[in-house]
Amino acid sequence: MQNIMLRIAYDGTAFAGYQEQENCRTVAGVLRGAVETLTGRSTRLIAAGRTDAGVHAEDQVVNFLTHLDWPADAFLYQLRCLLPDDLLLRSAQVAIPSFHARFAPHKTTYRYVVENGSYVLPTERHTVFSYTFPLNDALILEAARRLEGTHQFAAFSVPDPYRNSQRTVDAVTIERQATRLILRFTADGFLHRQVRFMTGAILLAGRGAIDLCNLSAAL
């Protein structure tokens, strides 16, 4: 058996997230279908992380086991022919037998682009979020700083009684480019919708809608 590692990128607009769901178009479902068409066998995909509906990815790692003793390039070129335009196979390589995408050490970085001006171009409507309220840069930077570190993020995620809500956020950075804000969140992993909730909290703090002390108390 060969262990094949794939690096994928996708436009999440038409996907209901990464994880397979019944009667939904998902990244895992489309990718698994292509792999099974190629190999002729049922295949289990293992992913380094999962994205929510509408979330895009530039470099996500997936691996699977196969009986086919092909070189990596054969998987790369043939799978590319089977995938739709909104799902790209960036690379393929033969990994060591013990490699497991989910448990391999890695960092995940989410990027949110917020337009704080009067409009978003139609060509950017799936990748840029419009937020027209005036923002105080000092407040959003302080809010970002308070979200860094190890905290209980239950208030910043979808409730799940079976999952530990403690996470360590390595960095939250905010870059301003004129009326545009680029927020980046880096951690070993995130809870369901945690990054969306943190982004919302930062923006609310920036417009003075929530107090920074209340933000800290929620952690």
Segments the model singles out, each with a brief description of its role:
Residues 1-219:
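Structured-RNA-binding interfaces characteristic of tRNA pseudouridine synthases
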